[in-house]
Regions:
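N-terminal export/assembly segments and adjacent metallocofactor-ligating motifs
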Residues: 17-27, 52, 68-69, 74-75, ...
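Rossmann-like dinucleotide-binding cores of NAD(P)H-dependent redox enzymes
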Residues: 28-31, 35-66, 70-72, 121-123, ...
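Surface-exposed acidic, glycine/proline-enriched linker/cap segments
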Residues: 116-134, 138, 217-238, 413-429
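General beta-strand structural signal in soluble alpha/beta enzymes
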Residues: 33, 72, 93-95, 115, ...
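Feature captures the FAD/FMN-dependent oxidoreductase FAD-binding
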Residues: 4-9, 14, 57-105, 201-213, ...
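Ferredoxin-type iron-sulfur electron-transfer modules and their immediate structural context
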Residues: 1-5, 91-109, 191, 204-209, ...
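Rossmann-like dinucleotide/flavin-binding elements
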Residues: 8-32, 71-83, 99-101, 118-180, ...
Length: 463
């Protein structure tokens, strides 16, 4: 036990992970959670058919059982935050992105729509009523997709009853946060997607929403963000029927929780040495695994700051591996393509607690495991021994081994850029591009001068 006390504001993925790691370091940790349960977006934002509640509760239980203190129903304002700074050695802010982005739509008040976050919280808590009539969801990200699939269940659209659930997005499907499998599942659930549309104004009858007026878009040149510019098509306005409107266009941090004068200065730091940030509050809306990683990193930073030394080091262990290049991976593994995981039948999806994607089962697990590229094995060429015979180039996959004229290096000596050439006369090096290497070992076995070696790298963490 270090005797140090740390407050974690927010019991979502980042806060829970930070608390667990800080407890492992020997600190006294207290989580302050404004809701009546821990989990954050795990319980409020991600639908049960994607992430079952019993799994979440089991994982949270494993963390809290380590001796972490939890204060529920505690909203931290500036006065309470300042008190925490007096009582605790460090404070971690991991409250996520709780403020929904709102696009102004003429003629609509807050009574005429809900946000994706609001809807998903009500849906996951079981407090939402069955929707009647057409539902429009504005957005093209993860929240919009989850909201639409939740609406399909709430409105019983899955079974084909009257009315439609429609996602409306201002760009094209290619720019949405959705893959082909998700599109197929939404199609099964009778969810419509309409693209290249932007909302203009709401149509109100008897103080209730009856439709949304849209304008059609076309895409211009790419902007600095990488996405194409959105331009309106003249005289293309039209109205879609809608009894319910949900705005699911992302969310942002609520910085008002920070005391006056405190600003975020880095990924985990602020201009107050006692206050740290992590997860979505630090980086914006990402995914759960990034928030978990943030929790681990901020805990290590806090421990180092409080104790004065870095107590858990990471280093790479490099050792010679097989002298014949055998990694256990063969060229025919490239022909093993992904297969679809099993999903439950559409008629069983009305119950919002039924997990849809059942994952890989039986032989599928082994089949997918053999697709691993074994990136911990690294093949390298000793340029002192290489005679530029090109035999390795001839036997390996295309673009794996290249003729290089010169390299650019970082200050740490890492290759930053390789200048490839097709001419033998200009080639100063023969180089293995590890990003394209499939670890088949053929280059090592065919090399006449034994210039190629195979090493195994392992990330080692001190306990």
């Amino acid at each position: 036990e270090t005797g140090k006390k740390i407050a974690v504001i927010g019991g979502g993925p980042a806060g829970l992970t930070a608390a667990r790691e800080l407890k492992r370091y020997g600190h006294n940790v207290t989580i302050f959670e404004k809701e009546k349960q821990l989990g954050g977006m795990l319980v409020d934002g991600i639908p049960r058919f994607r992430l079952p509640l019993d799994l979440i509760e089991e994982e949270i239980g494993l963390i809290t059982e380590t001796g972490i203190n939890v204060v529920y129903g505690e909203f931290i304002d500036e006065a309470k935050f300042n008190n925490l700074l007096k009582e605790y050695d460090s404070v971690v802010v991991a409250t996520g992105t709780t403020n929904a982005n709102i696009t102004p739509i003429e003629g609509l008040s807050k009574d005429h729509y809900s946000t994706g976050l609001e809807f998903m919280k009500e849906y996951n808590s079981g407090n939402i009523k069955d929707l009647k009539g057409d539902v429009i969801i504005i957005g093209g990200g993860f929240t919009a997709i989850d909201t639409a699939r939740a609406c399909a269940r709430t409105a019983k659209r899955i079974l084909g009853e009257n009315g439609e659930v429609t996602i409306v997005y201002r760009r094209t499907v290619e720019h949405m946060a959705v893959d082909l499998k998700e599109l197929n599942e939404m199609d099964k659930e009778n969810i419509k997607i309409r693209t290249l549309l932007s909302p203009l104004e709401g149509v109100i009858e008897n103080n209730e929403l009856s439709g949304i007026k849209f304008v059609r878009n076309y895409l211009g040149k790419g902007k600095e963000s990488g996405k194409p510019e959105i331009l309106p098509v003249e005289d293309s306005e039209f109205t879609m029927n809608a009894k319910h409107l949900i705005l699911a266009i992302g969310q942002k941090q609520d910085y008002s929780i920070l005391p006056t004068g405190v600003e975020v200065t880095g990924k985990f730091t602020t201009n107050n040495p006692k206050i740290f940030v992590a997860g979505d509050f630090s980086s914006g809306s990402l995914d759960v695994i990034h928030s978990v990683a943030d929790g681990k990193e901020v805990a290590e930073l806090i421990d180092t700051t409080l104790v004065g030394i870095k107590r858990r080091e990471k280093f790479l262990k490099i050792e010679e591996a097989s002298d014949n290049g055998e990694s256990g991976r063969f060229r025919n593994h490239d022909q093993q393509f992904t297969t679809e995981s099993e999903t439950i039948e559409v008629e069983n999806r009305v119950d919002s607690d039924n997990e849809v994607d059942l994952g890989f089962r039986g032989t599928q697990v082994n089949e997918h495991a053999t697709r691993c590229y074994f990136c911990h094995y690294k093949f390298e060429i000793d340029h002192e021994k290489c005679i530029h015979c090109n035999w390795c180039i001839d036997v390996t996959p295309r673009n794996c081994i290249k003729k290089i004229e010169k390299f650019d290096y970082t200050e740490d000596g890492v290759i930053e850029k390789a200048y490839e050439t097709k001419n033998d006369e200009d080639a100063s090096f023969i180089w293995i591009d590890t990003k394209n290497c499939i670890r088949c070992g053929k280059c090592l076995r065919t090399c006449p001068t034994r210039a190629i070696s195979m090493r195994k790298t392992t990330l080692v963490k001190e306990p």
